[in-house]
């Protein structure tokens, strides 16, 4: 997957997905399809500027990005090991003067308050010096107990914006 460093987002759609198949490549393709991100060439983004954005849904993202041959993705694609339970979370806060997106993937028990929410609230309150609004969060969990199939988990913020 191609990569870029930083992007100034204009529109953000957060999504998650899982896939299971007999090989990694197909499991990943199914996880991307489940997340709705299988229609474009993905370009991985390593960071986002914290400018205000518009949070949108899948249909609006597809409509707004229909003229582009690629899509910017900020997130993670992970493979679940045999005997492991993996959790994925992605959160977004958007206000008139600041926005932020964080994600996390981890194995083990699911947390009552997602890591991505905690980290995003801390980032918001540190930067803005006021209480954070409640983040919008999507979570996903997948446990692998089948040695004959590969399991893949996707957490992603799909971005329409300009590289910096």
Where are these regions (language model features)?
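Helix-coil modules at protein/domain termini and other flexible surface or pore-lining loops
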Residues: 1-164
């Amino acid at each position: 997957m191609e990569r870029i460093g930083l992007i100034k987002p204009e529109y953000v759609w957060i999504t998650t997905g899982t896939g299971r198949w007999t090989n990694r490549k197909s499991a990943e393709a199914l996880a991307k399809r489940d997340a709705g991100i299988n229609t474009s060439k993905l370009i991985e983004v390593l960071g986002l500027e914290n400018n205000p954005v518009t949070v949108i849904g899948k249909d609006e993202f597809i409509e707004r990005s229909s003229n582009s041959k690629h899509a910017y993705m900020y997130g993670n694609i992970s493979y679940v090991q045999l005997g492991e339970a993996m959790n994925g979370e992605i959160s977004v806060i958007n206000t008139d003067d600041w926005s932020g997106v964080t994600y996390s993937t981890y194995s083990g028990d699911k947390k009552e308050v997602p890591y991505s929410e905690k980290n995003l609230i801390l980032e918001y309150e540190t930067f803005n010096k006021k209480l954070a609004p409640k983040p919008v969060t999507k979570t996903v969990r997948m446990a692998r107990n089948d040695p004959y199939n590969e399991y893949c988990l996707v957490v992603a913020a799909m971005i329409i914006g300009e590289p910096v």
